[in-house]
Amino acid sequence: MLPFKTLALFLLTAVAEIVGCYLPWLWLRQGRSAWLLVPAAASLALFAWLLTLHPAATGRVYAAYGGVYVAVALVWLWTVDGVRPGPWDWLGVAVTLCGMAIIAFAPRGG
């Protein structure tokens, strides 16, 4: 899979997972409607389905996806929660994305 398509798929997967977890959080922590559990379940089902679209071995996909998840979660922190990440947050994301790139795009023998 091309690097751009892989990254786009990772981004969609991360957003689906975060939305699927954020909606129950709104229900449990902020007293929002229990009806939020319906789109949350759909979002988590989408998340699981998106994971099946990655062509690499599942362990490698989960490891590489974790790096993208960290980056998307930090952007979520900023845009949805209104908390601006600091320099150490961004450094952590950079290190994580370097690891993700190595795992996802390193040449493989065989």
Swiss-Prot record:
The chain crosses the membrane at residues 7-27, 33-53, 63-83, 86-106. SUPFAM superfamilies: Multidrug resistance efflux transporter EmrE. It comes from the Bacteria. It is a multi-pass membrane protein. The keyword Cell inner membrane applies. Its main location: membrane. One of its GO terms (cellular component) is plasma membrane. The keyword DNA-binding does not apply. Keywords: Cell inner membrane, Cell membrane, Membrane, Transmembrane, Transmembrane helix. It is found in: Cell inner membrane. Belongs to the UPF0060 family. NCBIfam families: PRK02237.1. This is UPF0060 membrane protein Ajs_2087.
